[in-house]
Amino acid sequence: MSKIAVSLCGEGRGHATRICTLVEHLERDHDVLLFTSADAWELLSKRFGDGHPRVRVEEIPGILFQYTDGRLDVLRSIAAGLDYQARQLGPLVDRLMGQLDEFHADLAITDFEPALPRAASRQGIPLVSVDHQHFLLAYDLDGLPWSLQWNAWFMSHAVWMYVVEATDTVVSAFFRPPLRRGWEHVVQVGPLLRREITEAVPSEGAFLLSYLRRHTPFSAIEALADCGLPVKVYGLGQRDSVGNVSFHAIDERRFVEDLAGCRALVSAAGNQLIGESLHLGKPLLALPERAHAEQMMNSYFLNAMGCGDFALLEEVTAVRVRTFLDGLGNYAPALAGVQGRIDGTADVIRIITHRLDVCAEAATAPAPESEPALPGPCG
């Protein structure tokens, strides 16, 4: 048994879903201490409450996207990140160092969260980075439009800020272009899929499923309401229906049932949800936010794979949704090639297990006779 500290970005639910999958495997044999914020803290504190004695969830301050008039505000988001780095990151690192020492952590794992990597580095604890965002650094993105390539270069600097000195770097993505020169050490895996997804049996129902982020413009709801099929929307809370659109509170079990049973998705363009959809063979019309470059990149790769299409969230119309629905058969061949074949969970568990084995061997290795053993990270 080992002691593993895990941190993750609290924005949205993709990071939380990915880490939830890992922790479900790790808690069988290890003690796990989780650090997160916002949406992820809400989800994980409930998921690993009573009945999970080997998992503890701690709330920490985190960085969130900033919105103005319902749209992602890149400049305000950057300013908020810089303010977090200047005012909160240092004290948080000091706090986590104390908690790592008290916990006697053997390994740290992070999904795009900046404090734990720094605390682990100072404590000499090996770090495994498992996230989606490292594709901005490691992947050959020459196939994207030049504007998105520029955005990837710009955003890659934030990845450097978040994660320092990782012993192992894993990129989890539903797409897999070649690695850039100098990044051959990165391990590419598919999305990390929770047990409920891998055990779900897909069927083709007579409704659409949609997961939308807060600040979704009402025009997008109107487009869904006039698409010709019932639409179940998650992510915006429970509220009165709008035409054929019904709104549902987040319920993980019910959401998976609807994902497995829907005809298709018209949804936000997060890596995790796209991966879950592809695993179940569901075509997807992604709705990236105009200013959200990562969502735009995910959408381009989805389209290039032939498994779906995309429309800007701010511009989607009922006609665009109906056109997508009329062409669902066009996506069947590509979906058949990935359905049930993209889960990367086992690959990540092997990497973590290997790192723990290396640490255990280093801890029990006899010291050279000529000099005493020195504490330090296991590499």
Language-model-detected regions and their locations in the chain:
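Donor-nucleotide binding loops and adjacent catalytic segments primarily
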Residues: 23, 190-264
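Conserved nucleotide-sugar donor-binding subdomain of glycosyltransferases
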Residues: 72-107, 114-115
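Conserved nucleotide-sugar phosphate-binding/catalytic loop shared by glycosyltransferases and other
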Residues: 10, 28, 33-86
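Nucleotide-sugar donor-binding patch of glycosyltransferase catalytic domains
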Residues: 146, 247-250, 283-328
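Active-site-proximal region of nucleotide-activated glycan assembly enzymes
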Residues: 126-188
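A donor-sugar binding/catalytic signature common to diverse glycosyltransferases
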Residues: 108-111, 258-297
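C-terminal amphipathic helix plus adjacent low-complexity
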Residues: 322-379
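A short, glycine/small-residue-rich beta-strand->loop->alpha-helix junction that serves as a flexible
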Residues: 7-20
